[in-house]
Amino acid sequence: MSERALPVVVCGAAGRMGRLLLALAREDARLRVAGAVEAAGHAAIGRDAGDVAGGAPLGVRVGDALAAVCRAEQVVLDFTAPAATLAHARIAAERGAGLVIGTTGLDGGQQRELAALAARTRTVFAPNMSVGVTVLTELVSLAARLLDASFEAEVVELHHHAKKDAPSGTALALGRAVAAARGQDFEHTRRLAREGLVGERPRDEIGIMGLRAGDAVGDHTVVFG
């Protein structure tokens, strides 16, 4: 490992993404795991982070407080839950640490607070980090601009049964891309559920449907019709 490796702190260390991040950081000479954090009372507290990730020891114990390990030269990797993410972002902003956030399910108020905190330190916040979804978002935006308003837009997403939030952050981002391309206010045009006698669909409505089944990693479809 290089002496100049970037020190990272993994929040949600025992979760699906946390374990993956720990494993990837261990194999990447450009990174050094400087800390690992889990919720107070979690069974992983006190264990070696490498063991939690299912690999060789990293020499870093999982703790329950980001404030105990967060330093300005570090980058905090957070794929947890909205309330925890905001708490971690406050600490990182106060200490001057970088932030990479992939948490989804934040409401409007939480997103506004996160945006204010992000202005105080270097931050990447994205509901989906994949190149494919980034390209898809650009293509959806282009299609929404080229197709006139008579083409109604619907977003459908499918994820594994263990995903906690719905609809997915990626589905919401795709809906926002459609709204932005058409000059619409997404918060007023989105429709997250339909049931019963709902009447005729408004032309500017953007429907978003979340499906949960099996172990699907994540499928997203945008329909213009």
What do the predicted segments below correspond to?
Residues 83-95, 102-125, 134-143:
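Rossmann-fold NAD(P)-binding glycine/threonine-rich loop
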Residues 76-77:
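N-terminal Rossmann-like NAD(P) cofactor-binding module of classical short-chain dehydrogenase/reductase
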Residues 4-70, 149-225:
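C-terminal substrate-binding/catalytic lobe of Rossmann-fold NAD(P)-dependent oxidoreductases
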Residues 111, 120-173:
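Adenosine-phosphate binding glycine-rich loop
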